[in-house]
Amino acid sequence: DLWKKTKLEKQLKFMIENNFEISHTSYEILKKNQKNKKILKAKTFKNFKELLPSCDIGLSTVMLKKKLISKNCQFPNLKTKEDFVLWLMILKKNIKIGGLDRNLTTWRKLNDSLSASIFQKLKDGFTLYNKYMKFNIFKSLLYLFILSINSLKKK
């Protein structure tokens, strides 16, 4: 992942001016051998229900106050979706995630990365909803289906 030179400065200023404890920025996805870049725009999330259907927060775009990470609020032991779980846990504490709609990060997507493993994504997606959000099997499968559809729309 690549940051623009002014990312930290602009994002910190955004957080201070808007009183956010955590924020993320827009980012572009750069795929190997592809000329067109896709930009995912950042938006502010006010509660965890807004983020449940699709993780639109790029890990390398996030800036947060250290105090948000605690024994009960940290990355879980998953191969994928660990960042998604953390953002949902933070939102469940009624902490808004600010969205700075400025493209300050480039994410290079590689075909052989963990992010590309469909089976692992499905497994971890189900675990996210069932174990960490404590949804029953049917609700977990429903949200996993919605997450999968939204993921396909991003491609």
Language model segments and positions:
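Short, solvent-exposed loop/turn segments at secondary-structure junctions
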Residues: 1, 29-30, 69, 105
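Paired acidic/hydrophobic, glycine-rich loop segments that form the ligand-binding mouth/hinge
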Residues: 3, 23, 98-99
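Glycosyltransferase donor-binding loop in the core domain
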Residues: 3, 15, 79
